[in-house]
Design a protein with these regions (language model features):
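Active-site beta-strand->loop->alpha-helix modules in alpha/beta enzyme cores, enriched
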Residues: 1-151, 158
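A sequence-level detector of short, solvent-exposed, charge-rich linear segments
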Residues: 94, 156, 185-188
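Short helix-capping segments at alpha-helix termini
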Residues: 161-164
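Acidic, glycine-rich loop-and-strand cores that form catalytic or ligand-binding grooves
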Residues: 173-174
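A conserved mid-domain beta-alpha-beta active-site/ligand-binding segment of alpha/beta enzyme cores
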Residues: 179-191
Length: 191
């Protein structure tokens, strides 16, 4: 039964924490523990023209032109099945983020992480509304070097520096799918 600890799973995208940690989340909730999955990058730029790599990614994943609502629905259903709470933050994932001049920051999802301290601080401020001294925060290891996973990993390290208990989880599919290594190599070559 619950010891008043809240277990918070940081998910870079819709489905990342669920895909990586569903067994453990299910175990926690079945024991009466409080679990909250916070998806960081679940916003979508409805009025923005997509860059070619975003269009290609949508096509590859069969996402359609405006995929976010369907993905949020799937995530809500998964969280309901696992009997955990969820929050969908409205920040954009890397392929949709732009700099101050309106230029896309990242050409592909395996880009090198840029300095986005303002965004990072905004996200941390929003996360702090859900944290207390009894929280355990789960954060991706960023094994596949997806820039958004690396970004969320850096948020985990910042929370750790702030004295929150942070545990890092292996992000699927990167940890188990050898074909992903081949795919990542090809993606890095996209221009």
């Amino acid at each position: 039964m619950s010891n008043n600890t809240k277990y918070i799973f940081l998910s870079p995208h819709l489905d990342d924490a669920i895909f990586s940690c569903s067994d453990y989340i299910s175990k926690l909730t079945s024991e009466g523990e409080i679990v909250l999955v916070i998806t960081i990058f679940s916003g979508y730029p409805l009025s923005q023209q997509l860059q070619p790599s975003a269009k290609q990614f949508h096509k590859l994943c069969n996402l359609g032109k405006y995929p976010i609502e369907e993905r949020k629905k799937e995530d809500r259903l998964a969280c309901e099945r696992l009997q955990c709470d969820f929050r969908h933050l409205s920040y954009y994932e890397c392929l949709y983020r732009k700099d101050r001049n309106g230029n896309f920051l990242y050409r592909h999802i395996y880009s090198e992480l840029k300095n986005e301290d303002t965004l990072k601080n905004d996200i941390i401020k929003e996360l702090l509304m859900h944290l207390d001294d009894k929280c355990v925060v789960y954060c991706p290891l960023s094994l596949g070097d997806h820039v958004d996973h690396v970004f969320v990993n850096s948020i985990g390290r910042a929370l750790e520096f702030m004295r929150y208990k942070v545990i890092y989880y292996e992000d699927f599919p990167y940890v188990s799918d050898s074909s992903m290594v081949s795919y990542m190599g090809k993606t890095k070559e996209l221009k």
